[in-house]
Regions:
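Rhodanese-like catalytic fold shared by cysteine-dependent sulfurtransferases
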Residues: 1-35, 43-172
Length: 172
């Protein structure tokens, strides 16, 4: 959803179990072809490539250091990367030179959201986004409203709140 390499195949999976199913169902004809895997930091690629090799794939490669390393070293003009890269911290996404991206997290489902998502009638700040709208219980909506109040109190008093947007360098 956030970014990818030009020409890559998106398995549209949310976890490793789904990825295994995708491989077994969709990549049978790729066992003798060159395969390049990429992920944010390279860790999940280790697991995926190991699984693929066990399943008989002959030429499985990984992007060393992951997309993060690639974006930090390859200038945008020479890059095959399209979009932003999801990261697992409060930055949410980064672009080339590891500059802050434009995505934020939906407070309800924790999925990345962009300007288009936020312009949807299904987006309610701190409550829902197009991905989770209509899936949130009344109890959770009440809790999310309370969290929003606490965030605003923290913000107005200049206090730390884990839901405010900080980068690691802001904290040290």
């Amino acid at each position: 959803k956030v970014g990818t390499f030009k020409g890559s195949i998106n398995p549209n999976t949310e976890n490793f179990t789904e990825f295994k199913k995708f491989i077994n169902k969709n990549l049978k004809d790729f066992k003798n072809k060159k395969i390049a895997l990429f992920c944010t930091g390279g860790i999940r690629c280790e697991k995926a490539s190991s699984y693929m090799i066990k399943k008989g794939f002959m030429d499985v490669n990984q992007l060393k250091g992951g997309v993060i390393d690639y974006l930090s070293k390859i200038p945008k003009k020479n890059s095959s990367w399209v979009g932003e890269c999801f990261v697992f911290d409060n930055r949410v996404s980064v672009i080339h030179e590891l500059k802050q991206g434009t995505y934020e997290l939906c407070h309800a489902c924790r999925n990345p959201i962009n300007k288009k998502d936020k312009s949807s009638p299904k987006y309610v700040k701190g409550i829902s986004c197009p991905d989770c709208f209509g899936k949130i219980s009344a109890k959770k909506k009440k809790a999310l409203n309370e969290r929003n109040k606490q965030i605003q109190i923290s913000k107005s008093k200049g206090l730390y709140n884990p839901y405010l947007k900080y980068t690691p360098s802001d904290l040290y």
